[in-house]
From Swiss-Prot:
Biased composition (Acidic residues): 135-146
UniProt KW Cytoplasm keyword: yes
Function, in words: One of several proteins that assist in the late maturation steps of the functional core of the 30S ribosomal subunit. Associates with free 30S ribosomal subunits (but not with 30S subunits that are part of 70S ribosomes or polysomes). Required for efficient processing of 16S rRNA. May interact with the 5'-terminal helix region of 16S rRNA.
GO biological process annotation, one example: maturation of SSU-rRNA
UniProt name for this protein: Ribosome-binding factor A
Polar residues bias: start-end ranges: 122-134
Location (main, coarse): cytoplasm
Record-linked HAMAP family: RbfA
């Protein structure tokens, strides 16, 4: 029977939890601020861990500054996490900004704008409920004759 969870996935989940705790409680660097650890991908040989993070900042310069602070502090963070996890080899941590949350919010705003635009047009030209199936049939008949 195949394993339900691979070892790398279990380690990635534990690493994600431990990183979240360390970044929240143990990091005193004011440049970093509030960080959310979205996901962790661990290489098969457990030598590297790609950590996907997001910040509450939308300004690209501030995001890059915070990411650089995390990258600079990565060896220290690795040491803190290694003390909390029982691994023979602690993966080298590489922080990556995860823009999927920001992109998701942007897409959601675009969809909301389109829906509001459609509602405004519907109110301006009359609701779709005013159009009956007879009107649609008549429109189809006139198109066929032309």
């Amino acid at each position: 029977m195949a394993k339900e969870f691979s070892r790398t996935r279990r380690i990635a989940q534990q690493l994600q939890q431990e990183l979240a705790v360390v970044l929240q409680r143990d990091m005193k660097d004011p440049r970093i601020g509030f960080v959310t650890v979205n996901d962790v991908d661990v290489s098969r040989d457990l030598s590297y861990a790609k950590v996907f993070v997001t910040f509450f900042e939308e300004d690209k310069e501030l995001v890059q500054e915070k990411l650089n602070a995390l990258i600079t502090a990565a060896p220290y963070i690795r040491t803190l996490v290694a003390g909390r996890m029982k691994l023979r080899v602690m993966p080298e941590i590489r922080f990556v900004y995860d823009s999927s949350l920001v992109e998701g919010m942007r897409m959601s705003n675009l969809v909301s704008q389109v829906i509001n635009s459609d509602k405004a047009k519907q109110q301006q030209f009359g609701s779709a409920e005013d159009v009956t199936s007879n009107d649609i049939d008549e429109a189809d008949d006139t198109e066929g004759k032309a």
